[in-house]
Amino acid sequence: MATSYRTILIHPGARSFTSAGLIARFPMSMVGISTILAVEELYGSYTAAGLVSAANFVAMAIGAPILARCVDRYGQSRVMLPAVLVSSLSLVGLAVAAAVHAHLGILAALSALAGGLAGSMGSLVRARWTAMLTRPEEVHAAFSLEAALDEVAFILGPVLATALCTTPFLPVISGWVCCVVMQLVGGLWFLGQRATEPAPHPTRPRRTAEAAEQSDQAAAHPPVMRYGAMVSIAIVFLILGALFGANDVAAVAFATEAGHKSASGLVLAVWGVGSFGAALLYGSRTWGWPLWKQLMAGLVGLAVGASTFGFAPSLVVLSVLALLTGLAIAPTLTSGNNIVQVTVAPSQLTEGLAWVSTALNIGVSIGSLLAGQATDAGGSRAGYLAVAAFAWGAVVVGVLGLPALRRARTSGSLDGH
């Protein structure tokens, strides 16, 4: 296993931009919980906290694909350096505004500005890997490594944010402050590594013969969301996000009903640990199946596992089921990202990855909302019914999208079909 990852990490600059990217993606998993904890504490309202948090989320969903398109055209550092700086300053402003009990409209505006300019760091890192690596099996290993690092951020980030916001001797805005520090340290370190930055693909290059040919080739590519495979993957990721969001709510409800509310974090952490381990194993070898089969196998595995949660008699059994089901998460997401990589043109890669990442994040919000309503009405069992429904919904969408997924562009394919 170690050999596969050692092979890609020996490339000049790989370890450096991977480390920077890991730090820079922590804020994505921390801002939401930091906002809810801080605003609720300072304003005494979960509604207000939800409003400010939603502003950040909606703006991020809108802004990430736009920033990604600009990155593909003009380059990562040229676009994201000012965006990261303004996003960080907006988070500082949000912390100050909340501390002085400013009007909620000001908080929402600052939260939206911070989210809209945050970008999708995972997409930027994966784009660097794609530009650096030439062998399909190396790209597969790199994307699996990134899936594992995503899990690290999303397992540890909320725990760190909660600890900072709830520790008695620290101000409740400490979660935001930590987000700013990690965004600046990781973001500036990452964007400062110009040697590994992918070359931009301007839409109007200088009209040399070579540039004219590049322009004609770029014009031949349809918009990202006109690819059938892209639409299928985006919808699948949207539903998977809903599954993840619903699972968060259902796990908290189950642990609360069992009289151990604090154990909900352990259940969710175990779910992430399973995904982390599977990501490393999945990326350590080349799989004989085409990508669409790998995706469908992962979706079915998730659906079967998620269908068992509602029958768990105890937290211990639920944790075991979550660990086993988590094994399907990272391989499923990685195969989906790999399909994006072989579907869109190189000049559209960052945008394509940002679209599916955005779909996943939107789904989390939708799943949390719907599962929250189901849980209020029928307890954790109803919440886990929603989890299972989302899981099988993703399978159905995957099956319906198979014609497009099987026709995905095969130049540089990872699956050899």
Question: PLM features: residue spans?
Answer:
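Transmembrane alpha-helix termini and helix-breaking/packing motifs in multi-pass membrane transporters
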Residues: 156-179, 366-382
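C-terminal ends and interior cores of transmembrane alpha-helices
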Residues: 85-101, 301-313
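Helix-loop boundary and gating motifs at the non-cytosolic
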Residues: 2-61, 220, 224-267
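Intracellular juxtamembrane helix-capping segments at the cytosolic ends
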Residues: 119-134, 251, 331-344
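Cytoplasmic helix-loop-helix junction between adjacent transmembrane helices
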Residues: 112-152
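Helix-to-loop junctions at the C-terminal end of transmembrane segments
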Residues: 63-76, 165, 277-291, 375
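A late C-terminal transmembrane helix in Major Facilitator Superfamily
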Residues: 347-378
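C-terminal transmembrane helical hairpin of 12-TM major facilitator-type secondary transporters
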Residues: 293-334
